[in-house]
């Protein structure tokens, strides 16, 4: 579409948007959850109908713009606003029903609202390498950030009903930080808040997540009269040292190449025989009465990494075709797992040139595996950048 058309749509947006095994323990006099999203043993429900998450991770980190610097901006460059709007339209056109946001400026929610018929998962980004999550300063800054993100969402969805699937309280906290926090606070083994009460054998890191989740729910309810589902995104390296069944559902970031490296003794999948399917089945079996959402899966096509190929593929070194076939294999593994899963989010929509800061963001490093996970690539056009679909975009569109 033409830039002028996007600008008119953006003007419309801006003129219509204003300024452990115990679950949530809502007090007896507290109203019922106002969210349209709920859960059963296996699925997330939207308006009491099973809702299979078909998601994509989206970070609007275009060259020269860092996500953590534009997050608070309310006056993004017009070229970036056009690109964000175009990206969200294309994500919807691909067949996705959910975008997983983190570091999202207000305009992302405005664009999602005007595109319509799309949902989102909101990540609360916690300093994952903090040496002590029980540090009062870490708690205070995390709570401040929770307020900022929730306020930003409701400044757009001021009718009080954002299409918010869940708030993710943290993503992949580091193993060293978890272990150091737990070692420093052996006396912390329980949390009791306004909405979350855990059992008495949790760790200090788990108590931190419970406290932040309780705060998010309390702030959202008391400020906006809405209560969203809450989760935490774990990963394979920390699967044995952090567990949060006191949240609404279980989330894991799961990558096919990581399983043979970190869990080589994982049983083969019951249907496809892959280690990836075996791993997600193991995760689900740990909490068979709670939904399991795969909040990230993806493959990097970084050119200078070693090539591995199917069925596990590699951490980088994949061809564009292998990225497409590998992602479809992951979706098939999820779809045919022994117990139903709640869905998946593909990591990620755009290549992330920005991973190592502003100077790095102007070019794509062939040696940096993390910069090449996108299902679309960035191409310079004049003084800005356009996107070009990779094979995986069309493959996902046909699958979904």
Predicted region positions:
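Aromatic-lined substrate-binding rim segments of carbohydrate-active enzymes
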Residues: 81-140, 205-208, 212-231, 280
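Active-site-adjacent "subsite" loops/lids of carbohydrate-active enzymes
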Residues: 75-76, 80-81, 126-153, 193-201
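Active-site groove signature of glycoside hydrolases
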Residues: 148-203, 231-236, 342-343
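Bacterial Sec-dependent N-terminal signal peptides
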Residues: 16-32
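Glycoside hydrolase catalytic-domain groove-lining segments
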Residues: 224-227, 238-313, 331-335, 341
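Aromatic-rich peripheral "rim/lid" segments of glycoside hydrolase catalytic domains that contact
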Residues: 340-400
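Aromatic-lined carbohydrate-recognition surfaces of secreted/lumenal glycan-active proteins
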Residues: 165, 199-241, 288-303, 339-349
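Active-site-adjacent substrate/metal-binding segments within catalytic domains
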Residues: 30-116
């Amino acid at each position: 579409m033409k830039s002028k058309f996007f600008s008119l749509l953006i003007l419309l947006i801006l003129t219509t948007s204003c300024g452990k095994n115990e679950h949530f323990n809502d007090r007896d006099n507290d109203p019922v959850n106002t969210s349209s999203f709920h859960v059963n043993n296996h699925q997330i429900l939207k308006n009491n109908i099973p809702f299979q998450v078909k998601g994509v991770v989206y970070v609007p980190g275009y060259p020269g713009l860092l996500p953590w610097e534009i997050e608070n901006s309310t006056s993004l460059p017009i070229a970036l606003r056009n690109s964000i709007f175009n990206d969200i339209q294309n994500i919807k056109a691909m067949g996705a029903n959910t975008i997983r946001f983190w570091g999202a400026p207000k305009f992302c929610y405005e664009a999602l609202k005007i595109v319509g018929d799309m949902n989102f998962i909101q990540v609360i980004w916690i300093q994952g390498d903090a040496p002590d999550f029980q540090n009062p300063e870490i708690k205070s800054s995390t709570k401040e950030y929770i307020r900022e993100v929730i306020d930003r969402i409701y400044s757009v969805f001021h009718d009080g009903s954002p299409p918010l699937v869940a708030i993710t309280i943290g993503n992949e906290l580091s193993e060293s930080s978890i272990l150091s926090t737990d070692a420093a606070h052996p006396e912390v083994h329980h949390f009791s808040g306004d909405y979350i009460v855990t059992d008495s054998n949790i760790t200090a890191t788990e108590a931190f997540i419970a406290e932040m989740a309780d705060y998010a729910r309390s702030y959202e309810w008391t400020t906006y009269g809405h209560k969203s589902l809450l989760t935490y995104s774990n990963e394979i390296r920390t699967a044995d040292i952090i567990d949060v069944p006191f949240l609404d559902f279980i989330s894991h970031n799961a990558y096919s190449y990581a399983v043979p490296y970190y869990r080589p003794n994982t049983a083969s999948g019951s249907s496809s025989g892959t280690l990836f399917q075996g791993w997600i089945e193991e995760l689900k079996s740990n909490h068979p009465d709670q939904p399991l959402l795969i909040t990230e899966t993806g493959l990097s096509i970084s050119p200078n990494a070693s090539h591995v190929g199917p069925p596990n593929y590699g951490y980088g070194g994949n061809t564009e075709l292998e990225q497409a076939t590998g992602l479809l294999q992951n979706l098939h593994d999820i779809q045919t797992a022994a117990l139903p899963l709640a869905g998946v989010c593909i990591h990620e929509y755009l290549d992330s040139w920005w991973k190592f800061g502003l100077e790095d963001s102007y070019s794509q490093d062939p040696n940096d595996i993390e910069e090449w996970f996108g299902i679309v690539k960035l191409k310079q056009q004049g003084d800005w950048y356009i996107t070009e679909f990779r094979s995986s975009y069309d493959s996902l569109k046909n699958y979904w």
